[in-house]
Design a protein with these regions (language model features):
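Proline/Glycine/Serine-rich low-complexity intrinsically disordered segments
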Residues: 1-118
């Protein structure tokens, strides 16, 4: 991927651009400001690759038959996402209890699978 002939597209700011700046030294990097149309850059042949979160790769590959994941099931780095809530102990406890219950029931895995395996 990191060759002078590769055209890489990335959304501005955040962890995707940070990863690209830190690790990609030779590819042609173009920042694309619109997160809704960035995937079209690859589909229409204006970019060769995009580095993004694994969950987004799975979702977009499922929604666009012209896209596919490289190294499915593997990632370039480790990153966990979290929930940020307003400071409210009762709400926090409710959300934590709900997530714990849903995770234990297998509901979260079911939702991810349903949306990723369309």
């Amino acid at each position: 991927i990191d060759t002078t002939s590769t055209r890489l597209v990335v959304n501005p700011g955040g962890t995707n651009e940070k990863f690209v700046v830190e690790h990609i030294k030779q590819a042609k990097i173009r920042v694309h400001d619109n997160n809704r149309t960035i995937f079209d850059e690859i589909i229409k042949g204006r970019a060769d690759v995009m580095i993004t979160d694994a969950i987004e790769v799975a979702v977009q590959a499922g929604e666009h038959s012209a896209l596919c994941a490289a190294m499915p099931g593997k990632t370039l780095s480790f990153q966990e996402k979290g929930f940020l809530l307003p400071r409210d102990l009762i709400w926090q406890q409710f959300v934590n209890a709900w997530l714990t219950q849903r995770q234990g029931e297998g509901y979260l895995a079911e939702v991810f699978n349903r949306h990723l395996n369309k």
